[in-house]
């Protein structure tokens, strides 16, 4: 079981305690509340208890409760957007549907989620800026607050895959600039056999940082800035690609 039971009061008691502890621990009021890849939403025990309900309806119900808790605790939430986008067209969950901008939006989905909710568009795979721009445009149907999450590919390998990282990051951040997305962050992940150190991803962080100051970032600029900021050698990190 990897999906919380929507509607069960024990779930919201747990979430309240969880968020309250985070609120006490950190100074920031911005908290990422996740909700991604909940492919089993509305199935399993929920289906046994309540019968079939569309995922859009269930997601809306759950999100309203969690946002109410966040408001009480004076937390500013952001949420992964994949389940919201997938629920909005009703074509099914999964990454292929998340990134498919040809699916028509259900009429009832246009106002299903608060427009002031920050939705985090995550994409670690596409190579064309136009693809990112199209998906960002779809997000803006639902919210004025879009954040982009890219990645430094430190998983699925013995070391960080900088060839892939550079291939996806440059078009993604260029698309964000053209689309007016001002907030971005770089993810790293520990699943699927990651064996390297997080320190290996420093060059990826430098790449993201430099796009905050320039429309184009070439290797010469990145090499110089990386040495200045970290004391590390650009070529050594690029050579780690496996």
What is the predicted role of each segment?
Residues 9-24, 28-31, 37, 48-242:
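Substrate-binding groove of N-acetylhexosamine-processing glycoside hydrolases
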Residues 39-45:
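Short acidic/His/Gly/Ser-rich catalytic and metal-binding motifs that mark active-site loops
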């Amino acid at each position: 079981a990897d999906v919380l039971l929507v509607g069960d009061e024990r779930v919201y008691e747990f979430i309240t305690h969880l968020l309250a502890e985070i609120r006490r621990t950190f100074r920031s009021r911005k908290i990422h509340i996740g909700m991604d890849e909940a492919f089993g939403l509305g199935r399993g025990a929920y289906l046994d208890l309540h019968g079939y309900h569309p995922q859009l309806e269930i997601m809306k119900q759950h999100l309203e409760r969690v946002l109410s808790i966040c408001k009480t605790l004076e937390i500013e939430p952001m949420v992964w957007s994949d389940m919201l986008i997938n629920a909005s067209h009703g074509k099914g969950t999964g990454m292929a549907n998340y990134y498919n901008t040809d699916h028509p939006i259900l009429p009832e989905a246009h106002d299903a989620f608060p427009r002031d909710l920050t939705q985090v568009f995550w994409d670690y795979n596409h190579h064309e800026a136009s693809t990112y721009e199209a998906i960002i445009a779809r997000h803006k149907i639902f919210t004025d607050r879009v954040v982009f999450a890219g990645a430094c590919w430190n998983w699925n390998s013995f070391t960080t895959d900088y060839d892939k990282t550079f291939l996806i990051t440059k078009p993604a951040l260029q698309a964000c600039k053209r689309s007016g997305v001002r907030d971005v962050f770089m993810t790293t992940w520990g699943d699927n056999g990651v064996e390297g150190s997080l320190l290996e991803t420093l060059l990826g962080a430098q790449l993201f940082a430099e796009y905050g100051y320039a429309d184009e970032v070439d290797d010469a600029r990145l090499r110089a800035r990386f040495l200045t900021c970290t004391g590390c050698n650009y070529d050594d990190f690029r050579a780690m690609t496996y």
